[in-house]
Amino acid sequence: MDKYQCREKVCSIEEADALAVGFTEKGQTEYQFIPFKLPELQDDEVLIKVEYTGICHTDAYWSRGLWGDFVYYPCVPGHEIVGKITKLGKSVTKYKLGDAIGFGFTCNCCGKCFHCTHGKGNRCAIPDSITFHKHFGGWATHYVGRESEAHLIPKEIPLEKAANLFCAGVTVFAPMRREIRPGDDVGVVGIGGLGHLAIQFAHHMGTFVTGITNTPSKKDEIISLGADNVLLSEDVDKNVGKGLFDVIVCCISAGNIDRYIKLLKTGGTFIMVGLPPMGNNNEIDINSVALGEYKIVGSVVGDNDDLDLVLKFAAKYKIFPKVELVDFDDFPKGINRMENERPRYRVSVKCQSTKYPKFNQ
């Protein structure tokens, strides 16, 4: 897409009061360091010094145009954002200077559309409601967001563990809290950034949890996360039709999804949270879905209520993502780690660690 009138102004390092990472123009393949001037704070907004920001596949898919040609430039991704408030808008009353808060996938929701008025602000009809669409996201040393979309970080959650709860955490927690009941047999497919959190949530929801993985070496670690059992992907076909699970949380976006659906009990629920690039679609056997009376549930991140609840749940049960941390100056290495390697299990950036002292305050 063409350039747009951005609130954040790209400038020289000398003029800048913040530093970001993203693309300045269409066609770039290597992420750039982008110095910029912060926008004027609106009455209902807060400015935070970003302490940690997560690196998520969504950021890469979106900014690289893998979900469609609707990216505006400059594009600064980032939607797992935690930091401390350094400035308050005139009408802000919910928070105070120094509070540790976070922002997730949506901002600037209209509050008026069908989705917003039916508890689905994460599906707001206004495209600009996505945190990094037509404004800078959280891959930056500083971030401006609305008071209404900020969430206080419970003191029980270390800040370096908090960022990934704002996407990976809420993405699995939101549908799980609606579909899972204590005593259910729950399968989690794909024990990566999403799956390792889904296992912990399912365990503390009072279920019997099975981690389903194609990596035998992860078995002990999966058990340590709270799983009661581990099923290797190579053994899935042997169990088709046996009715193993009330609910399956599918965290993978590629491969034969249909084989996992057929592990459900009659009337079971299949939650799909893994999203591939556009065009990489999967096929499922509609006949088996109908005959098994299965329910297929799609879910994308969560709304503000879901975010508040996942933070409280994580704080209560000490559920934290396993995170690899990188310095801000190594941001491109962190992106490469997420895109092309297999981190255990999420990657976050220490944003107050740039080589420029003025951006670390």
Label every PLM stretch briefly:
Residues 264-266:
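Helix-to-beta-strand junctions that scaffold the AdoMet/dcAdoMet cofactor pocket
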Residues 100, 185, 268-269, 295:
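Short glycine-centered segments of the SAM/dcSAM-binding site in methyltransferase folds
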Residues 2-16, 204, 304-361:
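C-terminal hydrophobic helical "lid"/dimerization subdomain
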Residues 182, 188-191, 203-259:
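Adenosine-nucleotide cofactor-binding segment
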Residues 109-189:
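NAD(P)H dinucleotide-binding glycine-rich loop of Rossmann-like/cofactor-binding domains
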Residues 195-196:
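N-terminal Rossmann-fold NAD(P) dinucleotide-binding loop
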Residues 37-53, 66-114, 151-157:
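Glycine-rich beta-strand-centered segment in the early N-terminal region that forms part
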Residues 275-292, 304-310:
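Rossmann-fold NAD(P)-binding glycine/threonine-rich loop
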